[in-house]
Design a protein with these regions (language model features):
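Gly/charged, well-structured mid-domain segments that form the phosphate/adenylate-handling core
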Residues: 10-41
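Short amphipathic alpha-helix with an adjacent loop that forms part of the alpha/beta core around
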Residues: 134-140
């Protein structure tokens, strides 16, 4: 992960934020990849409220002339309080420097609803499938954008990451 940390540090993300996020990495998580003219933060393996907030913080602190785009899906297996956890993440999104929020999944709609309450200028869109999301992103992404892909493994956002890296 040292090359990823170096890349993030060059973009003037505080070292404390880098260390905090690196401590949560393992195996298939948090790959930072240069794709064409944008940066992809592929963290599509798993999601919890804390891990999504940590990833959003890293995205928010990236120094870029482009947009900061969060592509999120449902957090699965959170039990009966799942809607509230999704709302909590939505409220957190409103406090970040994320410019665009794109989601898949029914519970993820809470992200948009809550984020809009505090930040109505946030550009958002909900997609009914990963295929629809991929088709949109392939034409939407521009030079210098930074894109975070984060969601529970069962939502299969890895499919989105792989398509963007192709």
């Amino acid at each position: 992960y040292s090359s990823a940390a170096s890349d993030v540090y060059k973009r003037q993300v505080p070292m404390s934020a880098i260390k905090a996020q690196l401590s949560t990495f393992s195996g298939q998580r948090q790959n930072i990849i240069h794709v064409n003219d944008y940066i992809l933060i592929d963290d599509a393996y798993n999601a919890s409220p804390d891990s999504i907030k940590a990833s959003l913080s890293i995205l928010s602190e990236f120094k870029t002339r482009g947009r900061k785009i969060a592509v999120l899906s449902d957090m699965l297996e959170l039990g009966p309080d799942s809607p509230e956890y999704h709302k909590e993440v939505g409220r957190f999104i409103a406090t970040t420097k994320v410019t665009d929020l794109f989601i898949t999944g029914e519970l993820s709609r809470h992200y948009i609803e809550e984020a809009w309450k505090e930040n109505p200028s946030l550009h958002t869109r909900a997609f009914s499938s990963n295929g629809e999301l991929i088709a949109f992103l392939e034409t939407y992404l521009k030079k210098n954008d930074v894109v975070l892909i984060k969601g529970s493994n069962g939502m299969n956002l890895k499919e989105v990451s792989k398509a963007l890296m192709a």
